[in-house]
Amino acid sequence: MNYFPWLTIIVFLPISAGSLLFFLPHKGNKLIKWYTICICILELLLTTYAFCYHFRLDDPLIQLAEDYKWINFFDFYWRLGIDGLSIGPILLTGFITTLATLAAWPVTRDSRLFHFLMLAMYSGQIGSFSSRDLLLFFIMWEFELIPVYLLLSMWGGKKRLYSATKFILYTAGGSVFLLIGVLGLGLYGSNEPTLNFETLANQSYPVALEIIFYIGFLIAFAVKSPIIPLHTWLPDTHGEAHYSTCMLLAGILLKMGAYGLVRINMELLPHAHSIFSPWLIIVGTMQIIYAASTSLGQRNLKKRIAYSSVSHMGFIIIGIGSITDTGLNGAILQIISHGFIGAALFFLAGTSYDRMRLVYLDEMGGMAVSIPKIFTMFSILSMASLALPGMSGFVAELIVFFGIITSQKYFLMPKILITFVMAIGMILTPIYSLSMSRQMFYGYKLFNAPSSYFFDSGPRELFVSISIFLPVIGIGIYPDFVLSLSGEKVETILYNYFYR
């Protein structure tokens, strides 16, 4: 056992170091930005070091475990730990947050508060992914909403307050169900509350009660993922938020919902999950088709990308519902893959907006000549989004396909029907994706914006784009890098479905 509190340091470093931002000179914008980037890089290096030297791939149990008594009255513990399921999202969080901080370089208004909120959000997300106590998971889940709401309401478009209010209403509503589920699981069948994930994973419940718990958690995670019809906050939020915030939302926030589905609904409530899994697959299939076809009708560039995110989350839901190791591994790979691709597309959409100050696709056109570097990167990452072979999206979606086909739970005809509908969704993806590129970069449209805005991508923007592109191509060529992290844990989770 490792006694050094690696995870506690990793959770507290961003927010505690970020609080020092308020003691920096008021007009030292450049100093504030460099300080924040250095904190993010230090955090990422510390996380990578701890995982490289103390995480063993062949061990499905909790590693780097920390267990401290916190509040005696509630028998509440500060429990942290990682396994194959959480290591990928934690590393993704560090990587995307570091690049989002670099992407936020143009932000000058209330710079100290902006960067502090990004670091506070970073701490909340790492805390959620590494929690081993149900109440601690809930606290981190809620804590992370505060900086997100402030980032949405204070920086962004003209309707940012409306979109931030919509976001907080949806997520707060979902949190009520999450709290009910947490208290129900913790207080069931014992005199003392039991909130430890390991203890709860071995506990059984009456079927009706387990279904009630499952529905409560499902609603909470469906808002965050998002799963239709609880997705309507997402396009508005992405349409109005600053693009660095969009990177964090698309890259990490949506993945927290999918992570919760696997960590709690699937791992702690396996009987209810096996009952609901056919419905998850049906909803996921509908989501792929609905969001892809809705995306095609969006005039707003960022809303079109937002609907593409909803469509891609459908594959994750199908992978989780397949109850096979192939399908679940595909879902985890899609979580990581779409984290990179979604963040990259929002970043490039934001840098394009910085130059031309246009958000509607029908007002754009002919940008390829003016900004060839952005055009090249946007085209490549659009190809990654439509699952071009050799990119991470292709491997993830293919593995989810295999997962649903090889599932023993479903009959042949439903599997053929679901696969056929998923294939239609994959055909719709290139239609809206290539249409978006055509409207932005091709044609001879005359702009109403001054020509002085049309300078191409600088070194900072190129660095961010290439840094996100490299993992996308790397995972596409060698997906086993991600799959090897989660393989043992996935087998352990699925063991419950057949031998519990």
Curated annotation (Swiss-Prot):
Keywords: Chloroplast, Membrane, NAD, NADP, Plastid, Plastoquinone, Quinone, Thylakoid, Translocase, Transmembrane, Transmembrane helix. It catalyses: a plastoquinone + NADH + (n+1) H(+)(in) = a plastoquinol + NAD(+) + n H(+)(out); a plastoquinone + NADPH + (n+1) H(+)(in) = a plastoquinol + NADP(+) + n H(+)(out). GO terms for molecular function: NADH dehydrogenase (ubiquinone) activity; ubiquinone binding. It comes from the Eukaryota. It comes from Gossypium hirsutum (Upland cotton). The chain crosses the membrane at residues 4-24, 31-51, 87-107, 113-130, 134-154, 167-187, 208-228, 242-262, 272-292, 305-325, 330-350, 386-406, 416-436, 462-482. Its main location: plastid. It is a multi-pass membrane protein. Belongs to the complex I subunit 4 family. One of its GO terms (cellular component) is chloroplast thylakoid membrane. InterPro entries: NADH_Q_OxRdtase_chain4, NADH_Q_OxRdtase_chainM/4, NADH_UbQ_OxRdtase, ND/Mrp_TM. Its EC number is 7.1.1.-. The keyword Isomerase does not apply. GO terms for biological process: aerobic respiration; ATP synthesis coupled electron transport; electron transport coupled proton transport. It is found in: Plastid, Chloroplast thylakoid membrane. This is NAD(P)H-quinone oxidoreductase chain 4, chloroplastic.
